[in-house]
């Protein structure tokens, strides 16, 4: 069985922020629900305070807690997804194409936010993406997979230095 400790040690930021939030609940209540699931906070007031701290963490105003998902932009929704992912103080966060559904202007800000939070919390970030320019910016180590097989792996410097596997080259030129 997966207890709160197991659930909170690994979390995920999904690709599409539009599909990850319940449209009938405020974003604050959704973060509080994640905190309850992870066993964080002994009282409602503790969880409410932690939820506000998480909004601070993802650089959203605290009054966003009362907003409904339909009132948020894609980048703001993704920030709420990031807040929920970090609610349980995870050891590992899997980010599956977390910026691909966002406008290019928002991608850099969300990528930087992920990197800042990862550094601040000393969390391992497994960043899945086809966009190697973002991977190069965010990663210490890179694994390139093609058809389910690892075709290249190493430090960011090693993987981004020629010679490239043909698939890596295709991703770089895309």
Show which residues each predicted segment covers.
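Q-loop/switch helix immediately C-terminal to the Walker
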Residues: 16, 25-37
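ABC ATPase NBD coupling module
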Residues: 1-11, 29, 37, 158-163
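Conserved catalytic motifs of ABC-family nucleotide-binding domains
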Residues: 89
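Conserved ABC ATPase signature
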Residues: 68-72, 76
């Amino acid at each position: 069985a997966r207890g709160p400790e197991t659930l909170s040690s690994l979390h995920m930021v999904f690709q599409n922020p539009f599909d990850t939030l319940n449209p009938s609940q405020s974003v604050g209540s959704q973060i509080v629900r994640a905190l309850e699931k992870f066993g964080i906070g002994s009282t409602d007031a503790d969880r409410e305070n932690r939820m506000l701290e998480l909004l601070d963490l993802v650089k959203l105003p605290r009054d966003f807690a009362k907003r409904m998902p339909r009132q948020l932009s894609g980048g703001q929704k993704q920030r709420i997804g990031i807040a929920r992912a970090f609610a349980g103080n995870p050891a590992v966060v899997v980010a599956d194409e977390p910026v691909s559904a966002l406008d290019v202007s928002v991608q850099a800000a969300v990528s930087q936010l992920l990197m800042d939070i990862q550094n601040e919390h000393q969390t391992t970030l497994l960043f899945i993406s086809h966009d190697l320019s973002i991977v190069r910016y965010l990663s210490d180590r890179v694994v390139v997979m093609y058809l389910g097989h690892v075709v290249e792996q190493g430090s960011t410097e090693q993987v981004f230095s020629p010679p490239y596997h043909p698939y890596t080259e295709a991703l770089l030129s895309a």
